[in-house]
Protein backbone atom coordinates (compact mmCIF):
# COMPACT_ATOMS: atom_id res chain seq x y z
CA UNK A 1 0.00 0.00 0.00
CA UNK A 2 1.31 3.43 -1.00
CA UNK A 3 0.02 6.49 0.84
CA UNK A 4 0.13 9.91 -0.78
CA UNK A 5 0.00 12.62 1.87
CA UNK A 6 -0.66 16.31 1.39
CA UNK A 7 0.87 18.60 4.02
CA UNK A 8 -1.47 21.56 3.89
CA UNK A 9 -1.33 25.19 4.98
CA UNK A 10 -4.45 27.24 4.33
CA UNK A 11 -4.41 30.60 2.58
CA UNK A 12 -3.74 33.42 5.00
CA UNK A 13 -7.02 35.19 4.22
CA UNK A 14 -9.13 32.10 5.01
CA UNK A 15 -10.24 31.55 8.59
CA UNK A 16 -9.97 28.09 10.09
CA UNK A 17 -13.70 27.38 10.00
CA UNK A 18 -14.09 28.26 6.31
CA UNK A 19 -10.96 26.30 5.40
CA UNK A 20 -12.19 23.18 7.14
CA UNK A 21 -15.68 23.45 5.68
CA UNK A 22 -14.42 23.91 2.12
CA UNK A 23 -11.90 21.11 2.37
CA UNK A 24 -14.49 18.80 3.89
CA UNK A 25 -17.56 19.63 1.81
CA UNK A 26 -16.18 20.78 -1.56
CA UNK A 27 -12.61 19.73 -2.24
CA UNK A 28 -12.98 16.32 -0.63
CA UNK A 29 -15.64 15.29 -3.13
CA UNK A 30 -13.40 16.27 -6.02
CA UNK A 31 -10.32 14.43 -4.73
CA UNK A 32 -12.46 11.36 -4.02
CA UNK A 33 -12.87 10.91 -7.79
CA UNK A 34 -9.20 9.92 -8.18
CA UNK A 35 -8.99 6.65 -10.16
CA UNK A 36 -7.89 3.52 -8.26
CA UNK A 37 -8.21 5.33 -4.91
CA UNK A 38 -8.53 2.85 -2.02
CA UNK A 39 -8.98 5.21 0.94
CA UNK A 40 -9.05 8.95 1.52
CA UNK A 41 -8.80 10.53 4.97
CA UNK A 42 -8.66 14.19 5.96
CA UNK A 43 -6.89 15.18 9.18
CA UNK A 44 -7.82 18.65 10.44
CA UNK A 45 -5.26 20.12 12.88
CA UNK A 46 -6.73 21.22 16.22
CA UNK A 47 -3.67 21.43 18.51
CA UNK A 48 0.08 21.99 18.08
CA UNK A 49 1.35 21.23 21.59
CA UNK A 50 4.33 18.90 22.12
CA UNK A 51 2.45 16.73 24.61
CA UNK A 52 4.70 14.22 26.35
CA UNK A 53 7.79 14.92 24.25
CA UNK A 54 10.80 17.18 24.77
CA UNK A 55 12.04 17.38 21.19
CA UNK A 56 12.42 20.61 19.24
CA UNK A 57 9.69 21.31 16.70
CA UNK A 58 10.56 21.67 13.06
CA UNK A 59 9.55 24.68 10.93
CA UNK A 60 6.25 23.11 9.88
CA UNK A 61 2.93 24.71 10.79
CA UNK A 62 0.28 22.73 8.95
CA UNK A 63 -3.49 23.10 9.06
CA UNK A 64 -4.20 19.63 7.76
CA UNK A 65 -2.91 16.35 6.39
CA UNK A 66 -4.57 14.44 3.56
CA UNK A 67 -4.00 10.70 3.21
CA UNK A 68 -4.86 8.95 -0.04
CA UNK A 69 -4.08 5.24 -0.33
CA UNK A 70 -3.35 3.35 -3.55
CA UNK A 71 -2.06 -0.11 -4.35
CA UNK A 72 1.24 1.40 -5.51
CA UNK A 73 2.96 4.72 -6.17
CA UNK A 74 2.47 4.48 -9.93
CA UNK A 75 -1.32 4.50 -9.52
CA UNK A 76 -1.08 7.62 -7.35
CA UNK A 77 1.18 9.38 -9.86
CA UNK A 78 -1.21 8.63 -12.72
CA UNK A 79 -4.22 9.78 -10.71
CA UNK A 80 -2.76 13.16 -9.80
CA UNK A 81 -0.55 13.91 -12.79
CA UNK A 82 -2.18 12.27 -15.80
CA UNK A 83 -5.90 11.79 -15.13
CA UNK A 84 -8.75 13.99 -16.38
CA UNK A 85 -9.36 15.34 -12.87
CA UNK A 86 -5.75 16.42 -12.20
CA UNK A 87 -6.09 19.95 -13.62
CA UNK A 88 -9.45 20.51 -11.92
CA UNK A 89 -7.96 19.41 -8.62
CA UNK A 90 -5.08 21.89 -8.87
CA UNK A 91 -7.44 24.71 -9.79
CA UNK A 92 -9.57 23.97 -6.74
CA UNK A 93 -6.54 23.67 -4.45
CA UNK A 94 -5.47 27.16 -5.47
CA UNK A 95 -8.74 28.52 -4.12
CA UNK A 96 -8.12 27.72 -0.47
CA UNK A 97 -4.62 26.25 0.01
CA UNK A 98 -1.66 28.57 0.53
CA UNK A 99 1.12 25.97 0.68
CA UNK A 100 0.96 22.29 -0.26
CA UNK A 101 3.80 19.79 0.05
CA UNK A 102 3.37 16.19 -1.11
CA UNK A 103 5.07 13.14 0.34
CA UNK A 104 4.68 9.50 -0.62
CA UNK A 105 4.96 7.00 2.20
CA UNK A 106 5.23 3.29 2.76
CA UNK A 107 2.94 2.57 5.69
CA UNK A 108 3.76 0.14 8.48
CA UNK A 109 1.03 -0.83 10.97
CA UNK A 110 2.54 -1.47 14.41
CA UNK A 111 -0.58 -1.36 16.60
CA UNK A 112 -3.72 -2.01 14.50
CA UNK A 113 -6.21 0.85 14.46
CA UNK A 114 -9.66 -0.05 15.88
CA UNK A 115 -12.76 -0.33 13.66
CA UNK A 116 -14.15 2.98 12.42
CA UNK A 117 -16.93 3.36 15.00
CA UNK A 118 -14.47 3.06 17.89
CA UNK A 119 -11.77 4.94 16.01
CA UNK A 120 -14.07 7.96 15.62
CA UNK A 121 -14.14 8.41 19.40
CA UNK A 122 -10.36 8.41 19.82
CA UNK A 123 -7.85 11.26 19.95
CA UNK A 124 -5.36 11.16 17.09
CA UNK A 125 -1.90 12.70 16.97
CA UNK A 126 0.25 13.00 13.87
CA UNK A 127 3.91 13.98 14.05
CA UNK A 128 6.53 14.68 11.41
CA UNK A 129 10.00 13.31 12.12
CA UNK A 130 13.42 14.52 11.05
CA UNK A 131 16.41 12.27 11.65
CA UNK A 132 19.56 13.38 13.41
CA UNK A 133 22.23 14.79 11.07
CA UNK A 134 24.61 11.98 12.03
CA UNK A 135 22.05 9.28 11.19
CA UNK A 136 21.71 7.95 7.64
CA UNK A 137 18.37 7.29 5.97
CA UNK A 138 19.00 3.54 6.19
CA UNK A 139 19.88 3.71 9.88
CA UNK A 140 16.86 5.90 10.61
CA UNK A 141 14.51 3.37 9.06
CA UNK A 142 16.11 0.51 10.94
CA UNK A 143 15.95 2.31 14.28
CA UNK A 144 12.39 3.49 13.70
CA UNK A 145 11.31 -0.09 13.11
CA UNK A 146 12.94 -1.06 16.41
CA UNK A 147 11.27 1.96 18.00
CA UNK A 148 7.90 0.48 17.14
CA UNK A 149 8.58 -2.37 19.56
CA UNK A 150 9.04 0.17 22.35
CA UNK A 151 5.82 2.00 21.49
CA UNK A 152 3.89 -1.27 21.60
CA UNK A 153 4.79 -1.59 25.29
CA UNK A 154 3.46 1.85 26.23
CA UNK A 155 0.12 1.81 28.10
CA UNK A 156 -2.95 3.26 26.43
CA UNK A 157 -1.79 3.19 22.80
CA UNK A 158 -4.94 2.37 20.82
CA UNK A 159 -3.29 2.51 17.40
CA UNK A 160 0.13 3.24 15.92
CA UNK A 161 1.29 3.53 12.31
CA UNK A 162 4.63 4.55 10.84
CA UNK A 163 4.71 6.27 7.44
CA UNK A 164 8.21 6.05 5.94
CA UNK A 165 8.75 8.82 3.41
CA UNK A 166 10.03 7.55 0.05
CA UNK A 167 9.32 10.53 -2.26
CA UNK A 168 8.88 14.28 -1.80
CA UNK A 169 7.45 17.29 -3.64
CA UNK A 170 8.06 20.67 -2.00
CA UNK A 171 5.87 22.06 -4.78
CA UNK A 172 3.17 19.70 -6.00
CA UNK A 173 4.17 17.99 -9.22
CA UNK A 174 7.88 18.81 -8.83
CA UNK A 175 9.92 16.02 -7.19
CA UNK A 176 12.56 17.33 -4.80
CA UNK A 177 15.42 16.08 -2.67
CA UNK A 178 15.63 15.53 1.05
CA UNK A 179 17.33 18.89 1.64
CA UNK A 180 14.26 20.73 0.29
CA UNK A 181 11.74 18.78 2.39
CA UNK A 182 13.62 17.12 5.27
CA UNK A 183 10.89 14.90 6.67
CA UNK A 184 11.82 11.24 7.18
CA UNK A 185 8.57 9.91 8.57
CA UNK A 186 5.09 10.72 9.77
CA UNK A 187 3.70 9.09 12.91
CA UNK A 188 0.03 8.32 13.55
CA UNK A 189 -0.94 7.59 17.16
CA UNK A 190 -4.38 7.05 18.67
CA UNK A 191 -5.33 7.38 22.35
CA UNK A 192 -8.56 7.48 24.35
CA UNK A 193 -7.99 11.14 25.29
CA UNK A 194 -5.29 13.66 26.23
CA UNK A 195 -5.01 12.25 29.74
CA UNK A 196 -4.27 8.80 28.32
CA UNK A 197 -1.70 10.31 25.96
CA UNK A 198 0.05 12.16 28.77
CA UNK A 199 0.02 9.05 30.97
CA UNK A 200 1.51 6.93 28.19
CA UNK A 201 4.50 9.21 27.68
CA UNK A 202 5.08 9.79 31.40
CA UNK A 203 5.00 6.05 32.17
CA UNK A 204 8.26 4.10 32.66
CA UNK A 205 7.71 2.48 29.26
CA UNK A 206 7.10 5.88 27.68
CA UNK A 207 10.30 7.31 29.13
CA UNK A 208 12.33 4.39 27.79
CA UNK A 209 10.67 4.83 24.40
CA UNK A 210 11.52 8.51 24.20
CA UNK A 211 15.07 7.89 25.37
CA UNK A 212 15.48 5.53 22.43
CA UNK A 213 14.04 8.21 20.15
CA UNK A 214 16.92 10.55 21.02
CA UNK A 215 19.38 8.11 19.43
CA UNK A 216 18.07 8.71 15.90
CA UNK A 217 15.51 11.58 15.84
CA UNK A 218 16.40 15.28 15.79
CA UNK A 219 12.97 16.95 15.50
CA UNK A 220 9.40 15.88 16.25
CA UNK A 221 6.62 18.25 15.19
CA UNK A 222 3.35 17.11 16.75
CA UNK A 223 -0.24 17.91 15.80
CA UNK A 224 -3.51 16.71 17.29
CA UNK A 225 -6.00 16.18 14.48
CA UNK A 226 -9.65 15.41 13.88
CA UNK A 227 -9.82 12.77 11.17
CA UNK A 228 -12.62 12.27 8.68
CA UNK A 229 -12.96 9.47 6.16
CA UNK A 230 -14.01 10.55 2.67
CA UNK A 231 -13.50 7.23 0.82
What residues fall within each predicted segment?
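Macromolecular interaction modules
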Residues: 1-231
